[in-house]
Swiss-Prot record:
Residue numbers binding ATP: 46-54, 69
Protein name, as recorded: Mitogen-activated protein kinase 11
Phosphotyrosine: modified positions: 200
Gene responsible for this protein: MPK11
PANTHER family reported in the protein's UniProt record: MITOGEN-ACTIVATED PROTEIN KINASE
Length: 369
């Protein structure tokens, strides 16, 4: 099983030596990359995201091609600065085939005078969003293999006491062998944190009902809802719930899975939230087999168990891995968990941008003593 490897073109920019030859500066589409000299030219632009531009480069010391993400003006505001630090700390803690790995943080030449952060990751060829939008044929075997790897990685993440909170196709990275890795942990939280809703600015299409309804306490079930949305999108090649706003988002959800009855609203602590849901237009549950005619019976059954309004009744990651749809791939002994739970104990309310800059510099020194 394979997918076509995209071609991003070459960049003839050979760079300028700076800081006594220890670093090389490249101009990539007007973005200045300052990288250690071990990353040899050319730098090849391969992507641009909300947090920065990404280039491929060769590590001359290891002979590996890597992805370098430049986060420009990384300390311009406290929210973005925390997001960068959070991802660095989390990915350093994790070690799993289906979670993207940080290989290096390029050490800034001056510890107290830098504004950009350059993070080096494993290089992947593409992401699931691009594959879904492409003309690449996707079979049931593709779907099963993608889903299995996503759940296998998510089992590890959840076992580390972490909720990803931003699972969507563009955050699932792939190579030409169809190996999948979960990326972008900038919005992740531990299960015990209480300030969950702060800074929550991601696309609403993959958000669970409890998030749309501002439920103050939520669980790992929010990630399972997102996985269900992704599974449906792989099969239909279009988003399941492309809502323009919160109101339409809830309507699209209830049009498919049916309006919840009172027994499905127990997770809502707020009387106002329950009243709001009850006054929404009522929809019967659609026939999933008719709505998803290209999905196998087992795939449809698993999708239905993921897209459940009440998070307490939603299938868990461990239950999903044991589902008959994944039986050809499921091996309990090959689905490791994280040995130590992760704690965001470095995140104090009094943390300033300068504090975060110092912490990120320290992380870069660990990679480059």
């Amino acid at each position: 099983m394979s997918i076509e490897k995209p071609f991003f073109g070459d960049d003839s920019n050979r760079g300028v030596s700076i800081n006594g030859g220890r670093y090389v500066q490249y101009n990539v589409y007007g973005n200045l990359f300052e990288v250690s000299k071990k990353y040899v030219p050319p730098l090849r632009p391969i992507g641009r995201g909300a947090s920065g531009i990404v280039c491929a480069a060769w590590n001359s010391e290891t002979g590996e091609e890597v992805a370098i993400k430049k986060i420009g003006n990384a300390f311009g505001n406290i929210i973005d600065a925390k997001r960068t630090l959070r991802e660095i700390k989390l990915l350093k803690h994790m070690d799993h085939d289906n979670v993207i790995a940080i290989i290096d943080i390029i050490r800034p030449p001056q510890p107290d005078n830098f504004n950009d952060v350059h993070i080096v990751y494993e290089l992947m060829d593409t992401d699931l969003h691009h594959i879904i939008r492409s003309n690449q044929p996707l079979t049931d075997d593709h779907s099963r293999f993608f889903l299995y790897q996503l759940l296998r990685g998510l089992k590890y993440v959840h076992s580390a006491n972490v909720l990803h909170r931003d699972l969507k196709p563009s955050n699932l990275l792939l190579n030409a062998n169809c190996d999948l890795k979960i990326g972008d942990f900038g919005l992740a939280r531990t299960k015990s944190e209480t300030d969950f809703m702060t800074e929550y600015v991601v696309t609403r299409w993959y958000r669970a009902p409890e998030l749309l309804l501002n439920c103050s306490e939520y669980t790992a079930a929010i990630d399972i809802w997102s996985v269900g949305c992704i599974l449906g999108e792989i099969m239909t090649r279009e988003p399941l719930f492309p809502g323009r706003d919160y109101v339409q988002q809830l309507r699209l959800i209830t049009e498919l899975i049916g309006s919840p009855d009172d027994s499905s609203l127990g997770f809502l602590r707020s009387d106002n939230a329950r009243r709001y849901v009850r006054q929404l237009p009522q929809y019967p549950r659609q026939n999933f087999a008719a709505r998803f005619p290209n999905m196998s019976v087992n795939a449809v059954d698993l999708l239905q168990k993921m897209l459940v309004f009440d998070p307490n009744r939603r299938i868990t990651v461990d239950e999903a891995l044991c589902h008959p749809y994944l039986a050809p791939l499921h091996e309990y002994n090959e689905e490791p968990v994280c040995v130590r739970p992760f704690h965001f104990d470095f995140e104090q309310p009094s943390l300033t941008e300068e504090n975060i800059k110092e912490l990120i510099y320290r992380e870069s020194v660990k990679f480059n003593p």
